[in-house]
């Protein structure tokens, strides 16, 4: 059975959503990142980058949420766009846009606003600006069509959902007013029964919630290892 290594963070939840939507049997394996589970040798043997999510499917190992969604979509044939070169090009382009842009800029905006030991105006402005810019591109896309790729719900929408459902946390209260079409899609996805099942995974394991010194050391090693 496929093993799914996860935490309650946005990127693992994208994969949890696919697994629950698809009905693919899987074994959830919690990785408590605030306790440092991601740095244990048995986990870095699966993902040398010490991040979640990852999956092990027989003799196949895949890490990074975007790669996992592509793998699972191709494996099952579910939640994929039409089998045309045009649709394939759009799928890959928007998956990479989300993986390399929406996700990282959202994460860094949250980090510098909420977790950095000092408020650095330049860093906050840069990452919040870039997060806004990326969501603006998505908004323009969704103003013209119902879903990110084609006229059906695909893994691209799941990939977007992971971070986009947290827009008020990323960009601040009132941010939804700027992105009504993004909100429309996220509200539609949130209403799907699979979302409730995916979210329930977080309650199956009592993940550490305290952001104490142990958590900081486990999640943000640069705070304790000066290299520049």
Show which residues each predicted segment covers.
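Short coil/turn segments at secondary-structure boundaries
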Residues: 107-108, 200-202
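GST-like domain detector, emphasizing the conserved glutathione-binding G-site
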Residues: 1-129, 139, 216, 226-228
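Active-site-flanking alpha-helical
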Residues: 73, 163-164, 199
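Short, solvent-exposed turn/loop segments enriched in Gly/Ser/Thr/Pro and often Arg
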Residues: 32, 155, 202-204
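Acidic/histidine-enriched, glycine/proline-rich intrinsically disordered or flexible terminal extensions
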Residues: 202-228
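Phosphate-coordinating loops and pocket residues in cytosolic domains that bind phosphorylated ligands
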Residues: 45, 191, 200
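GST-like fold's C-terminal all-alpha helical module
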Residues: 86, 94, 98-193, 228
């Amino acid at each position: 059975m496929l093993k799914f290594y996860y935490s309650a963070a946005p990127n693992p939840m994208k994969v949890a959503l696919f697994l629950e939507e698809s009905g693919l049997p899987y074994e959830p394996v919690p990785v408590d990142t605030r306790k440092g589970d991601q740095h244990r040798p048995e986990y870095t043997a699966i993902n040398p980058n010490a991040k979640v999510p990852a999956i092990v499917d027989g003799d196949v190992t895949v890490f990074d949420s975007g790669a996992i969604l592509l793998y699972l979509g191709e494996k099952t044939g579910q939640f994929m766009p039409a089998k045309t070169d045009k649709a394939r090009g759009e799928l890959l382009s928007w998956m990479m846009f989300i993986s390399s842009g929406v996700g990282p800029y959202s994460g860094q905006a949250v980090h510098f606003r909420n977790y950095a030991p000092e408020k650095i105006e330049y860093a906050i402005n840069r990452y919040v600006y870039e997060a806004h810019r990326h969501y603006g591109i998505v908004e323009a896309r969704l103003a013209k069509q119902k879903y990110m790729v084609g006229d059906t719900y695909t893994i691209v929408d799941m990939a977007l959902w992971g971070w986009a459902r947290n827009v008020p946390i990323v960009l601040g209260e009132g941010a939804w007013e700027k992105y009504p079409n993004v909100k429309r899609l996220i509200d539609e996805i949130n209403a799907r029964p699979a979302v409730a099942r995916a979210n329930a995974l977080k309650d199956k394991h009592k993940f550490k919630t305290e952001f104490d010194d142990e958590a900081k050391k486990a999640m943000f090693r640069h705070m304790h290892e000066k290299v520049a």
